[in-house]
Structures are given as C-alpha cells and as structure tokens.
C-alpha cells in the first residue's frame, strides 16, 4: 500500500528537472514543492527549479469549484509545501499542476484500503469550536471532533492541539458518498488509570 502523507512530510528536493516532471506526469506520481505566490485569479505559483509551475484555481483544492471549499484554503498555502501532480506543460514551458488530483488520490486510497480503527499520520491544519481539521494525505482533510479528542471534557480543541502539530489519528468512520473522514484520538490515549498515572 502506497500511503499518502500530509503536506510537508514528503521529501522535497531543492528543485526538479524537466525530466523529473515528465516522469512524474507519466507515473502519476505525487510531488511536493513550496507555493510561492497566489495571483489575483487565485492561481498558485509553485517553486519547481527548472521552470515555472502553476496550479490553476480550479485545481488548487478539492471542492473549490462547488463552493464547499473557500478561497482562503488556497491563499493560506503560500509559503508552505504543497502536494501536486503534473498535468502537462503550457506552450511557454510552464508546468501545469493539480493539487486537487493529489487530494482526490489520497482520499480514494483511504476509502479503498482503510477501515474504521486504522491509524493514519496527520497534521492539524485548523481549529474550530467543534473540532480540529487534519491533513490526512496531500492536503485532504479529516475532522477530529471535539468529543473525540480525549476522555476529558474540553471547551475548545486548542486546549489540547495546535495548528501544525503532527499526530497519529484513528479513523472513526468513512463516508465515501459525502467524501468525509471522521477521526478520533480517544482510543489512542489509553485508559483513565493510564492517563492519571
């Protein structure tokens, strides 16, 4: 099983050659590089080394065209590593990239090969009053609900977690039809007696 990792955890070379990009396109391989700019059309510009790389707005995040994902999900990636696939090259040599396809590939594998109870590596990407959003592969999100963080009562996930924190999470439920993954930490924390010791 080829496990997809959260963004920032993939090896990231100083730069890619055109041959690296062509091979990745043929093999549908996931690459990672830093997003260096978001232009006025909300296209992400990516530092590749050998050429310019652009992720068009429609390819910058799952759900952006349907309105399920807001533009802040694109803007917030600037200065950070992002995962992508190579879709092709423009006539001027600019590499056309897709973060959305990398996210879809990660989710497809999770829905196909994982079951509730499986453990995934994750990185906390956002905190809300109802829980924490976690990158569970190539920027694809799972929700770690407030009640599933620990056996104690918390008023906010920030009481226990911080954005950027790496942690193992357990899959609580999978909903392929709605493309949702619910996560939990409770089962990984041990019993009351173990936690009190």
Please provide the spans of the model-predicted regions:
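Single-stranded RNA-binding regions, centering on S1/OB-family and related RNA-binding modules
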Residues: 1-197
